[in-house]
Amino acid sequence: MNGDTRAAVVTSPPPTTAPHKERYFDRVDENNPEYLRERNMAPDLRQDFNMMEQKKRVSMILQSPAFCEELESMIQEQFKKGKNPTGLLALQQIADFMTASVPNVYPAAPQGGMAALNMSLGMVTPVNDLRGSDSIAYDKGEKLLRCKLAAFYRLADLFGWSQLIYNHITTRVNSEQEHFLIVPFGLLYSEVTASSLVKVNLQGDIVDRGSTNLGVNQAGFTLHSAIYAARPDAKCIVHIHTPAGAAVSAMKCGLLPISPEALSLGEVAYHDYHGILVDEEEKILIQKNLGPKSKVLILRNHGLVSVGESVEEAFYYIHNLVVACEIQVRTLASAGGPDNLVLLDPGKYKAKSRSPGTPAGEGSGSPPKWQIGEQEFEALMRMLDNLGYRTGYPYRYPALRERSKKYSDVEVPASVTGHSFASDGDSGTCSPLRHSFQKQQREKTRWLNSGRGDDASEEGQNGSSPKSKTKWTKEDGHRTSTSAVPNLFVPLNTNPKEVQEMRNKIREQNLQDIKTAGPQSQVLCGVMMDRSLVQGELVTASKAIIEKEYQPHVIVSTTGPNPFNTLTDRELEEYRREVERKQKGSEENLDETREQKEKSPPDQSAVPNTPPSTPVKLEGGLPQEPTSRDGSDATTSKPTPPDLSPDEPSEALAFPTVAEEAHASPDTTQPLAEADPEPASASAPGAEEVASPATEEGSPMDPGSDGSPGKSPSKKKKKFRTPSFLKKSKKKSDS
């Protein structure tokens, strides 16, 4: 193309659709060597390169673990829908192809075997191949046993314990019907699957042939049948021929206790093996040599046998037996003989603990109690699953701890999320690394948007603001972040019926009110204690205490405590005489009051002569407290008879005021004075009355008192006045 042609193109009217070649050549540099190579390439070769580029994406999708998981979930859903649905065989073939085509990115096998070659080629036959009608033919327990035994065969091949098609590992399926699982004779250990195992009875007759057309080596099964018949506790038997085991079986010293693995086997049994067990006497002899408790049997010049109550226990004993034999063979080769070896004492040797402790700082709960060999076997099953064997083993305890999310309190996810694909044409399929990265981003975005469980709806533009506003509306049926946990305080692994019965029993006790304070003392059971009430003690009369018989001897007191309870007869007699003397003095004081009323001016009203009592001293020198009108007495610090003088108008232990005396009746002291006919001379003749420090200012008639109508504001209120009997004694002393 020259310059004239380009000018003609410019001047000509533009076409409606520009040609594709012209846009392409405008973008391509003709002098680029890469462009020249592609232009000179043959069309078929160019098409092949384009197909390879397209297949790269397909292969990447097929090799992604996410696609495998989704495919397996689809297969499981198809199994649930029917036995032979349309397209199930195609999905199964795709799943097998995906399992076999996974690249070898996992760690290598422990030692080797045929399985190592298969893994290097990316061709691993899955252990759990029970699908379709095969899985329906067996119950759940037999499925698990088939998967365990087939995985055991794979482990034996990986550890190098296999010897072509020989050796056998068997397990008991049903103790009632005496059915056993064994490998078909002619199948390598690396080819054994769950469906290929053969079910036989105790005589070696085939009950279920499995998925193969191979038979059973009945001569090899006779050893297993003899042990199963003698040991009902045996659930799994392993018989292998390893070089180290055959070497130890040929030694006269047998297995020496020179390693912890040798001591972990317990009592080791030996049997002189003379070939295949064809007669009954040989079976009886091997049963006698094994005994009822031995877990390990060494066949002289032949091989090793282990017996276990489970598949895991049988693997544990055979593994330790093989390791102990290898240690002994290598030790004898370097030491020169058994005499140069140091033997361990089984009684003093402390075996390692099999129950791991709870990790520090974790409160999620203790791990399960492992049986013998379960923890080791489960770890090896995880290894096989990581290698792509698909063992189908039911794990008891997860190896990886699920990290608790930081924002687990936000239960309700966001109504809207900001995550989107890179482009509209992106289908969502990506590489595993990108898928993991996007999953983390989605988790973070989900939490950021999950602050509210409401629905966000945007309102359109209005006249006030050109921007859209977000309006939150409450979602119906929204769950709260905290929900009640059922049976929160019920212990785990308990019978719920027992918990309900205990709850009903507690409720019945509460309704019938039959709960007690607990067991009574047997020492003080029959002792009756008489309690005497002391002065000032608070006596309770609670109805609940009386009815519940917590306090059998209850004294119900309707009045106050007796103030004369602690006084002697002599003190009571002196108190009686003192009261009589005071009453006599009150009568004389009343006469003096009448005389003063006559001499007083007529405009002043009469005020009752009830002066407060002041402390006096008896002949014993004891102070006398003021008395109350009603005869009650307040206790003193010393055992002095209480003063029940009728002069005081208050019941409390306090001096009355003038205002209180003003409201008192002038005749209040008269009945008390007339009640005592005895003369005032009945008091003790030797009693001396000492005048109190009160002055003469406290006269009986105080015009400044509150009760007087002629009260003078210049006069101060007198709170304390001299008693009448003290005034009388003072007059006598003056005269």
Swiss-Prot record:
The keyword Cytoplasm applies. Residues 715-732 are annotated as: Interaction with calmodulin. InterPro entries: Aldolase-II_Adducin_sf (IPR051017), Aldolase_II/adducin_N (IPR001303), Aldolase_II/adducin_N_sf (IPR036409). It is found in: Cytoplasm, Cytoskeleton; Cell membrane. CDD domains: Aldolase_II. It holds the Pfam family Aldolase_II. Residues 1-21, 418-486, 576-735 are annotated as: Disordered. One of its GO terms (cellular component) is adherens junction. NCBIfam families: PRK07044.1. Membrane-cytoskeleton-associated protein that promotes the assembly of the spectrin-actin network. Binds to calmodulin. This is Alpha-adducin. It comes from Rattus norvegicus. The gene is Add1.
